[in-house]
A protein has these predicted regions:
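Short catalytic micro-motifs in class I SAM-dependent methyltransferases
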Residues: 93-94
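Conserved class I S-adenosyl-L-methionine
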Residues: 1-31, 44, 127-129
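A short glycine-rich, Lys/Arg-flanked "PGG" loop and its adjoining helix->strand segment in the class I
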Residues: 104-116
Length: 177
């Protein structure tokens, strides 16, 4: 059993208590149309999306705590959607938990299913040791990783949540040409 499954019952109340939910919603500030939330956990963003929301998480224990009609238990490295399905693809505090080799196929999939905008709120390099401890990150994301996965990065920043997480906005490279 993995840590996410064990923590599922306490995860959402703890995140609300520490103010993470408010920080997390910053990824939606420029979203439009349909939104895919990769690594959605208990789908805290679902009620803040005016259009169609689809949440994907591999952990059924997290999804059973979520509310919303469009929740999918699936591996983010093999998203079960056709190319260019979603207007906006978001992810918060998920990618930084993975090693770069595990992240790469997920980043590629996020670009594949997106038509317009990708927004992530994740620990981004460089990150001080103290801030890295706040994120529980295995390794902060490097902007070059995003570009290598087919993203055209439009903006990096601001840092939020004690400066430990950075909002990154990108487009799939096919669209940015």
């Amino acid at each position: 059993m993995d840590v996410g499954t064990v923590l599922a019952p306490a995860y959402d109340p703890l995140m609300r208590l520490c103010g993470w939910t408010r920080a997390q919603r910053s990824v939606l500030s420029a979203s439009q149309g349909s939104v895919l939330d990769v690594g959605c956990g208990p789908a805290r963003l679902a009620d803040a999306v005016p259009g169609t929301y689809v949440g994907v998480d591999l952990r059924l224990a997290m999804l059973t705590r979520a509310h919303g009609p469009h929740l999918v238990c699936a591996d983010a490295a093999a998203l079960p959607f056709p190319n260019r399905t979603f207007d906006t693809v978001v992810s918060t505090a998920f990618l930084g938990l993975l090693s770069p080799d595990r992240r790469h196929p997920i980043l590629c999939e996020m670009a594949r299913v997106c038509t317009h905008r990708i927004r992530i709120l994740e620990p981004v390099s460089p990150l001080s040791t103290a801030r890295r401890a706040l994120t529980l990150s295995r390794q902060p994301i490097d902007i070059d990783e995003l570009c290598d996965a087919g993203w055209h990065v439009r903006s990096v920043g601001p840092r939020v949540y004690a400066g430990a997480y950075t909002l990154v906005t990108a487009e799939p490279q096919a669209q940015s040409r």
